[in-house]
């Protein structure tokens, strides 16, 4: 059973939730062999109805104490561009698609996704581009994220937010 896990973190990202459960996106996931989609929707107002039909299951929840189990079971992670969610997924060695919130484009999240993509660790897109990216991406091209280098990440974030030149 191939599983895709979607996380929006502690905030809301209704556009992402709606995009992922749209019929065309679900059909693309099915065509790629995914038959289980798990959504962590945070405090969003879009609340898809969970269902299970042969051969596809959709599970939905707002929060859990830890996402560790969902990340471990995931064959693909689709995440908002929050630094914590990105790093946790990458450190677990999971293929990652980061969806940048177009309403927050003037923040560090876009820069982080862009840099980690440039280094070959993830794919990124906006909500409207997600179906096309899912169809065209080659997960085998992703490079493993080197674990245990928080100082490198911290320095990058400092530079992005203007604390360091």
From Swiss-Prot:
One Gene Ontology cellular component: cytoplasm
Top-level taxon in the UniProt lineage: Eukaryota
Record's bilayer topology term: Peripheral membrane protein
Molecular-function GO term, any one: N-acetylglucosaminyldiphosphodolichol N-acetylglucosaminyltransferase activity
Keywords for the protein's UniProt record, in alphabetical order: Endoplasmic reticulum, Glycosyltransferase, Membrane, Transferase
Chain's role: Catalytic subunit of the UDP-N-acetylglucosamine transferase complex that operates in the biosynthetic pathway of dolichol-linked oligosaccharides, the glycan precursors employed in protein asparagine (N)-glycosylation. The assembly of dolichol-linked oligosaccharides begins on the cytosolic side of the endoplasmic reticulum membrane and finishes in its lumen. The sequential addition of sugars to dolichol pyrophosphate produces dolichol-linked oligosaccharides containing fourteen sugars, including two GlcNAcs, nine mannoses and three glucoses.
Subcellular location: Endoplasmic reticulum membrane
SUPFAM superfamilies per the UniProt record, alphabetical: UDP-Glycosyltransferase/glycogen phosphorylase
Full protein name: UDP-N-acetylglucosamine transferase subunit ALG13
GO biological process terms, semicolon-separated: dolichol-linked oligosaccharide biosynthetic process; negative regulation of TORC1 signaling; protein N-linked glycosylation; regulation of synaptic plasticity
Enzyme class: transferase
Its EC number(s): 2.4.1.141
UniProt family annotation: Belongs to the glycosyltransferase 28 family.
Pathway: Protein modification; protein glycosylation
């Amino acid at each position: 059973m191939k599983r895709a896990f979607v996380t929006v973190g502690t905030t809301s990202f209704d556009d992402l939730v709606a995009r992922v459960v749209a019929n065309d996106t679900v059909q693309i996931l099915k065509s790629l062999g995914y038959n289980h989609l798990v959504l962590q929707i945070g405090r969003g107002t879009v609340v898809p109805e969970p269902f299970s039909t042969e051969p596809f299951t959709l599970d939905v929840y707002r929060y859990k104490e830890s996402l560790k189990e969902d990340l471990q079971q995931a064959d693909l992670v689709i995440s908002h561009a929050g630094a914590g969610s990105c790093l946790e997924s990458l450190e677990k060695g999971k293929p990652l698609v980061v969806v940048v919130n177009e309403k927050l484009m003037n923040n560090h999240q876009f820069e982080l996704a862009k840099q980690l993509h440039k280094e070959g660790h993830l794919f990124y897109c906006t909500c409207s581009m997600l179906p096309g990216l899912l169809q065209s991406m080659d997960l085998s091209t992703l490079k493993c994220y080197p674990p245990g280098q928080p100082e490198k990440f911290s320095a990058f974030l400092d530079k992005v937010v203007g604390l360091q030149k």
